Protein backbone atom coordinates (compact mmCIF):
# COMPACT_ATOMS: atom_id res chain seq x y z
CA UNK A 1 0.00 0.00 0.00
CA UNK A 2 1.34 3.39 -0.98
CA UNK A 3 1.22 6.51 1.15
CA UNK A 4 1.64 8.67 -1.93
CA UNK A 5 -0.56 11.72 -2.32
CA UNK A 6 -1.04 14.14 -5.18
CA UNK A 7 -0.53 17.37 -3.22
CA UNK A 8 1.01 18.40 0.10
CA UNK A 9 -0.03 21.79 1.44
CA UNK A 10 2.54 23.18 3.84
CA UNK A 11 0.96 25.93 5.87
CA UNK A 12 -2.47 26.87 7.15
CA UNK A 13 -2.61 30.59 6.65
CA UNK A 14 -5.02 32.24 4.21
CA UNK A 15 -3.34 30.80 1.09
CA UNK A 16 -2.96 27.26 2.47
CA UNK A 17 -6.54 27.19 3.73
CA UNK A 18 -7.80 28.47 0.39
CA UNK A 19 -5.78 25.82 -1.46
CA UNK A 20 -7.30 23.09 0.72
CA UNK A 21 -10.81 24.42 0.10
CA UNK A 22 -10.28 24.22 -3.65
CA UNK A 23 -8.63 20.78 -3.58
CA UNK A 24 -11.46 19.14 -1.62
CA UNK A 25 -13.67 18.62 -4.65
CA UNK A 26 -11.04 17.92 -7.31
CA UNK A 27 -10.55 14.21 -6.72
CA UNK A 28 -6.87 14.77 -5.96
CA UNK A 29 -5.53 13.35 -2.74
CA UNK A 30 -3.88 15.85 -0.44
CA UNK A 31 -2.62 16.43 3.06
CA UNK A 32 -2.28 19.78 4.78
CA UNK A 33 0.17 20.51 7.56
CA UNK A 34 0.35 23.56 9.81
CA UNK A 35 -1.33 25.52 12.55
CA UNK A 36 -4.31 27.54 11.34
CA UNK A 37 -3.62 31.26 11.12
CA UNK A 38 -0.46 30.82 13.22
CA UNK A 39 1.51 33.76 11.84
CA UNK A 40 -1.52 36.01 12.14
CA UNK A 41 -2.14 34.86 15.74
CA UNK A 42 1.47 34.99 16.92
CA UNK A 43 3.34 37.61 14.91
CA UNK A 44 0.92 40.42 14.12
CA UNK A 45 0.56 43.35 16.52
CA UNK A 46 -2.47 43.13 18.80
CA UNK A 47 -5.13 45.68 17.97
CA UNK A 48 -4.04 46.17 14.37
CA UNK A 49 -6.35 46.50 11.40
CA UNK A 50 -5.89 45.05 7.93
CA UNK A 51 -4.97 47.42 5.13
CA UNK A 52 -7.45 45.69 2.84
CA UNK A 53 -11.13 46.53 2.80
CA UNK A 54 -13.75 43.94 3.71
CA UNK A 55 -14.47 42.98 0.09
CA UNK A 56 -10.76 42.26 -0.45
CA UNK A 57 -10.16 40.26 2.74
CA UNK A 58 -11.79 36.97 1.75
CA UNK A 59 -10.18 33.58 1.72
CA UNK A 60 -11.08 31.66 -1.43
CA UNK A 61 -13.42 28.71 -1.74
CA UNK A 62 -14.96 27.25 -4.91
CA UNK A 63 -18.51 28.37 -4.12
CA UNK A 64 -17.46 31.77 -2.72
CA UNK A 65 -19.75 30.93 0.20
CA UNK A 66 -17.27 31.30 3.05
CA UNK A 67 -16.57 35.00 2.75
CA UNK A 68 -15.67 37.44 5.48
CA UNK A 69 -19.14 38.92 5.04
CA UNK A 70 -20.77 35.50 5.60
CA UNK A 71 -18.66 34.95 8.72
CA UNK A 72 -19.55 38.39 10.11
CA UNK A 73 -23.24 37.80 9.45
CA UNK A 74 -23.06 34.39 11.16
CA UNK A 75 -21.21 35.75 14.21
CA UNK A 76 -23.00 39.10 14.40
CA UNK A 77 -19.85 41.15 13.75
CA UNK A 78 -20.09 44.44 11.87
CA UNK A 79 -19.08 44.26 8.22
CA UNK A 80 -18.84 46.65 5.30
CA UNK A 81 -17.42 45.98 1.87
CA UNK A 82 -15.71 49.35 2.04
CA UNK A 83 -15.06 51.91 4.75
CA UNK A 84 -15.08 49.78 7.91
CA UNK A 85 -11.63 48.54 8.95
CA UNK A 86 -11.21 44.78 9.38
CA UNK A 87 -9.71 44.07 12.78
CA UNK A 88 -6.95 41.52 13.19
CA UNK A 89 -9.01 39.59 15.73
CA UNK A 90 -11.98 39.36 13.39
CA UNK A 91 -9.78 38.22 10.51
CA UNK A 92 -8.12 35.54 12.67
CA UNK A 93 -11.50 34.28 13.87
CA UNK A 94 -12.69 34.23 10.27
CA UNK A 95 -9.66 32.15 9.24
CA UNK A 96 -10.21 29.70 12.11
CA UNK A 97 -13.87 29.29 11.10
CA UNK A 98 -12.86 28.79 7.48
CA UNK A 99 -10.37 26.10 8.58
CA UNK A 100 -13.02 24.24 10.61
CA UNK A 101 -15.52 24.41 7.78
CA UNK A 102 -13.37 23.77 4.70
CA UNK A 103 -10.08 22.21 5.84
CA UNK A 104 -11.26 19.47 8.22
CA UNK A 105 -8.30 17.20 7.44
CA UNK A 106 -5.74 19.79 8.51
CA UNK A 107 -2.93 18.10 10.43
CA UNK A 108 -2.02 20.62 13.10
CA UNK A 109 1.70 20.15 13.41
CA UNK A 110 4.99 21.97 13.06
CA UNK A 111 6.96 18.73 13.22
CA UNK A 112 8.79 18.44 9.91
CA UNK A 113 9.26 14.69 10.40
CA UNK A 114 5.53 14.14 10.00
CA UNK A 115 5.65 15.82 6.59
CA UNK A 116 8.50 13.84 5.02
Where are these regions (language model features)?
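N-terminal Rossmann-like FAD-binding beta1-loop-alpha1 element of flavoenzymes
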Residues: 2-32
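Glycine-rich active-site loop/strand segments that organize a redox cofactor
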Residues: 29, 33-89
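Non-catalytic DNA-binding core/recognition domains of DNA-processing enzymes
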Residues: 92
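Active-site helix/loop of acyl-thioester processing domains in fatty-acid/polyketide metabolism
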Residues: 98
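Short loop/edge segments at beta-strand edges and connector loops
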Residues: 106-110
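Conserved small/polar residues in nucleotide/adenosyl-binding loops
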Residues: 113-116
Amino acid sequence: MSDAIDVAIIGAGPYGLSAAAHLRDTGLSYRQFGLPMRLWRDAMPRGMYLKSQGFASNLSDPASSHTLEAFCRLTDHPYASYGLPVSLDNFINYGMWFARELAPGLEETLDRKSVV
